[in-house]
Amino acid sequence: MADIKEGVEEGSVKVDMIKEPLTQGDTGVDEVDFAKITLDDAFKYLNCNKHGLSSAEAAARLQQHGPNKLPDSSRNPVLVFLGYMWNPLAWAMEAAAIISIALLDVADFVLIVGLLLINAIISFYEESNADKAIKALTAALAPKAMVVRDGAIVTIDAVNLVPGDVILIRLGNIVPADVKLLEEEGADEGEQEAPMQIDQAALTGESLPAKKFTGDVAFSGSSIKQGERHAVVYATGVNTFFGRAAALISGTNNVSNLQTVMNKMSAICIVTILLWVVVELAVQFGHYSHECVGGREGCPTLLNMLVVLVGGIPIAMPTVLSVTLALGAYKLAREGAIVTRMSAVEEMAGMDVLCSDKTGTLTLNKLSIDKSMVVPVGNMGVDEIMRMGALSANTVTEEPIDMVLWESYPDRETIKRDYKHTKYFPFNPNDKITIATCLEIATGRVFRVLKGSPQVVLAKAWNAAELDATVNQKMVEFANRGFRALGLAMADGDGKDGTKWEMLALLPLFDPPRHDTKETIEHCQNQGIQVKMITGDHLLIGKETAKMLGMGTEMFPSEVMIKARNGDASQLHGYKNFVEMVETCNGFAQVFPEHKFEIVKILQDSNHVVGMTGDGVNDAPALKKADVGVAVADATDAARGAADIVLTEPGLSTIVTAVIGARKIFQRMTTYSKYTIAMTFRICFTFGLITVIYDWYFPTILIVIMAVFNDGAMIALSKDRVVASKTPNSWNITNIFIMGMVYGLYLTLSTWALYQTATKTTFFEDKTPLHSLNDQYSVLQPWCEDEVRAKLGQTIDPYASLCESNSYAKQFDECEGYQKGSGVQVEDVPTLHAQCVTEQRYLRGAMTRSLIYTQVSISGQALVFVVRTAGYSLMERAGTSTYLAFFFAQVGATLFGIFGLGGFEKPRHQLEDCQFCDYSFHEPVDWFDSGIVPESGTESDFTASVIGCGGYVIVAWIWSAIWYVLLDPIKWILFWILNEEGFRDTMSWRESTKRSLDRRSKDDIGDKEFTGPSGMVPANYSNPLGRASMSKPVSAVLDRKSASLVAINRNSMTVSQDPNRALNIGRRSMIGRPSGPVGRTSMPLGRISRTSNTLSTGSKDGQIGRGSKPLNSSSAEIKPDKYDFASTIRE
């Protein structure tokens, strides 16, 4: 590699000579400090010049040096797959598998391992597909770079940059590679150089932007805060300063909020399971004196413990939640909202305040200039003014204002032919102007054209005092009509010998509101989101736009905000304090980026989840600070880098769609969370209680099969059709735990009642044609006496030795030489009656297990339909995938319940060809061909076997349906007590049910219908404006925002100014739709109350109803404001 000659003095910025240029495969990063060598030496070292590379040279270098990106952080797919089996829940399942194989229970071991593998395969497949799809959609967000190729500036993907490329970097760009700045374009020798300001805090820790001049270096990843300059690339990819730093921290790993939530829920489940495991073992080994001598034959108690351990573990939880999030993020990306931080989906679901910029989000950002409204303030005519405007534009950057000025001048070709830009001073947020230095080719005349904020342009004019009144008056007129004002000035010369600026004109820029913004804002408010306009434009422009959009006009300029923050009570405008003012008002105008940051912080301190939109480099701090930073379409690289969500489609509607999508994702995740907690409690308490009280066994194989059917089907929840919550969402583990516990205990009660009814009563035998499953001795004693006589003859003594049976006598050595009919008892040989009781208990218990299995499976998965909605579950249509999952899972469970396992597992102390295992009506048992039964007296090491319960599956379905009916009322009671989703604050359960009935015929994404006033929450006596503010509205606001209500009856009409009385008239008629702090400006004319025969009217532009007189004498015209009239030309 090339070496630098020795002899360079320490601190020198010049290299005497470079032995050889950069060669193939080299970058020179480690050999040369580019900050200390001259530009000429850098060009020699990189083997290039200021005119950049040709396409062929760039392609060759790309092959040699590789792409300008860090190495892919993708992990080995095998390790990713295995990772799905490495978490606390999987560890518990793996422990169960180890116990199974240690006890030589191969079948359970295989099924448990199979369940783990199925879960991992589904997770790997679904998440991989979602990740690939998201990467494909985010390819459009790949950083771009403006590079000089073949002598022309072209835009390419930054990944294709190579050492030696000359690029153009400007305000808002993220520096795409390590570069060395070239001299300013068009700069003359001796002219003072304007520095670039580059924010490299993320790389170097500098708190303030660094000033950079010609020859200085800028690192990849830093952002341009001011200026525009060409630069030569000297390092790309891993060889950049950022690349080497990233390599050092690549091992760090942050725990997401979802992972934290899963850890908490996993802990709840595991603690519950372990408690029951301890109780079961203590009772069975203690009270029931079970023994454990090792091996499968000698320790059935441990196998029974696996039922609680395997059944209670929500093994599918990481899969369902992560896949739900991944698939949801993919769907958001398809709808124009690309998630850069996955946990932002959860925060977007909880967002209750959205601070939106005006330009491009609430408006179209398609500027136009009405030439008839141009205001000349000098000696030029309108055509000449428009020509100067076109000359001031830099069309390379394609900024909206530059483009509208350029395109508004019809004779653009003459400008290209007759003039040349020799220098361009770009816009920056501090100066608020641009300056173009122009050369008239024919005459050699040099002049400069300045455009920008009217106040700034006016201040530079030589006759500013004379023009001040005219300019301010016209600015107010423009603002009253919703126009932004742009100042234009010119001066002869290039500025070296002083400048005499002459202001030429004020140009009106109109940016029309989006056609769907008004409806979208209404929808936002109906979804519990307060929209605040945060604009850099003049206050009057903001208010006029707000009126067009139906927003509230309670807006203030940043000057008022600053004074109020500093304790000036006169600027509070009736609010109690500054915090309430920020929280309650509809927006702020004439704001700077630091104001946005402060607004976000104040709202967050008031317990709001705040979303902030932005597009510029100076919006980055506020975007980073916000809970949900949203970079709008066509945002700068810096804004995109700071945002959590990047929009690819313009407009507020995309944000609302993303919020609704995020809430749906959240709804799916909380649905599964409630379900899985409920199932843990249900399995633990159901089988734990029956085992502890009755020393009852349940085969592990059944619980594993149930987990395969039901937990596998839960993946469908990630694609379920849900209705987004009307209120912001957040994880409330306490509520999830309480609701899951109540559901689980209720389902436990349903199974317990079924077990008691089937095994301790004769209800089913008496009321249905089904045989009895009653296992009580009082029932079995007479039945077995009849059964023994029916099988062996009426003269046989039922209590005689088992040796009386030819079949069984062959299986006992003790029966050798036994004389039938002697009635002699044989030691160690059970009696006929005792064997009959044992066989019947074995048979009925085995069939009861199939019944319980089927009922637990059906009622458990049916719970999903209850917890997925706040309304009536039978009327809220679920997704097709959810129905199909339930159908196939329960068809499998039903078939399994009918046919069972034919007596598997076989009893350890067994007799073949059972003699007394008929149904209770003395018919042979179906699906029990083996006839293997346990020997009487071996119950202490009894193996839990399974035989199909046949027609009892109908009982399981009917029983589950009956108990299902009460789940919705229980849910509503819990919603009321816990105020889930604002249930208690916003509606009664009857209203919730009615609303769910209304919704089921609608498309699930829209819910366009208003369900309350236009404010955040429905009005009530303590909150008559329906505000979502944490603080009570001040009296001044109530007085200012109250509207009259006209109550009409046949004989009289009364007008009420009392908000409380308004509430008595009718819920929907309250204050019309108030133009309150968070409401719309007014209500549509003559809206009829739904709850009473009243007509509610609201003011719109100062008018009431059709043709009626105003309530007050205030005019709809906006008066000139006392505040500073400086308006910015971009937000």
UniProtKB/Swiss-Prot annotation:
- Read off the Pfam families from this record: Cation_ATPase_N, E1-E2_ATPase, Hydrolase
In Gene Ontology terms, what is a biological process of this protein?
proton export across plasma membrane
List, in alphabetical order, the Gene Ontology terms for molecular function in this entry.
Answer: ATP binding; ATP hydrolysis activity; metal ion binding; P-type proton-exporting transporter activity
Q: Name the residues annotated as catalytic in the UniProt entry.
A: 357
- Topological category with respect to the lipid bilayer: Multi-pass membrane protein
Q: What is its EC number?
A: 7.1.2.1
**Which SUPFAM superfamilies does this chain map to?**
Calcium ATPase, transduction domain A (SSF81653), Calcium ATPase, transmembrane domain M (SSF81665), HAD-like (SSF56784)
| Enzyme class of the recorded protein, top EC level | translocase
Q: Which Gene3D superfamilies match?
A: Calcium-transporting ATPase, cytoplasmic domain N, Calcium-transporting ATPase, cytoplasmic transduction domain A, Calcium-transporting ATPase, transmembrane domain, HAD superfamily/HAD-like
Catalytic activity annotated for this protein? ATP + H2O + H(+)(in) = ADP + phosphate + 2 H(+)(out)
Which positions form S-S bridges?
none
**Membrane spanning stretches:** 77-97, 98-118, 151-171, 231-251, 265-285, 305-325, 642-662, 689-709, 733-753, 884-904, 946-966
Localization per record: Cell membrane
Swiss-Prot/TrEMBL keywords: ATP-binding, Cell membrane, Hydrogen ion transport, Ion transport, Magnesium, Membrane, Metal-binding, Nucleotide-binding, Phosphoprotein, Translocase, Transmembrane, Transmembrane helix, Transport
Start-end of Basic and acidic residues biased regions: 994-1010, 1118-1131
Give positions of region: Disordered. 994-1023, 1067-1131
Which residues are recorded as binding Mg(2+)?
615, 619
Enumerate the PANTHER family for this protein.
CALCIUM-TRANSPORTING ATPASE (PTHR42861)
Name the family: Belongs to the cation transport ATPase (P-type) (TC 3.A.3) family. Type IIIA subfamily.
What's the stated role of this polypeptide?
The plasma membrane ATPase of plants and fungi is a hydrogen ion pump. The proton gradient it generates drives the active transport of nutrients by H(+)-symport. The resulting external acidification and/or internal alkinization may mediate growth responses.
What's this protein's name?
Plasma membrane ATPase
Q: Tell me what organism the protein belongs to.
A: Dunaliella bioculata
Query: What gene, per UniProt, encodes this protein?
Result: PMA1
